[in-house]
Amino acid sequence: MDPSNVQEVEKLEEIDPDLSLTQDDAEEPIGKLNATCVSALAMILKSIWNINVFASSREDESVFHEFLLNDLSLKHPLEANGVFDLFLNILEALPNWGLYFEVYEVAKKICNRCKLDLEYPAERSFRLIISASSLREVKSAFKDFTFENIIKVIKMNLKMPCDKEGCGKQSYVHRMITKLPSVFTIALEWTKNETAGEIFDTVSVLATEINVNVIYQCEGDIRYTKYRLVSMVCLHGNRYNCVAYENNRWVRYLRSEIEVIGDWENVVSICLKNIRPQILFFENVMQREQ
């Protein structure tokens, strides 16, 4: 094994004790990788480095990048919205990272007809998936609604049938999270045929600050339910970019350069160039300021 590879393996194990690379893993040739997958990986990592809880890992960016290039399967094109799955694969490869993103959601339902009261087991997830078309539709119907209220409406419409012991009627579900994550992640699902105008209308709905307590019923101190957008993974053609908030302005990371965007209105405007935000990372405001 090359001495430099040994040093990288040892460095990874120091950073995350759960990580281990065997000699075979480290020496396995990468082969021909899919350019879009490699682009997506780079921009997911770039977005993550902009989150404060990962600040201590930034100096090891190249180590993590090299490890994931070898560990993940990046030889085949991503499927539609497949960047979400790649993000989950990263968290699976680096399990300690997942602790910052995980959300345990509890669903409660009281049937309006038979009054059967049900509480479902907590489900673990790492992101909230929202359809881009649903954002546009709800915004069109409720023009004064904020981003978080629009998400609340979308989630409320996800009804569940009354249990087999009840009447079977579809009922609204109250959703609660028992532990606030350090990073609240939203994944936007797109089709491949949105017009530039539809992309613009979708991004216009987004906000840079959200209160998770509007979307869910949250246990604990409500002072910790406010989150601020710090970075986004975006798709532009067949390449991924990272849009991040740095030094009081928004910038866009391309393959080998940084484009200064400016304020949030400018971020929305550049999406007329068919730039689709796909993963949004919101960091807890209180934790970020501490």
Predicted stretch roles:
Residues 27-30, 34-43, 109-112, 184-185, ...:
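Conserved, well-structured core segments
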Residues 25-28, 35, 43, 61, ...:
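Generic hydrophobic/packing signal
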Residues 30, 105-108, 154-161:
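Processing junctions and N-termini across compartments
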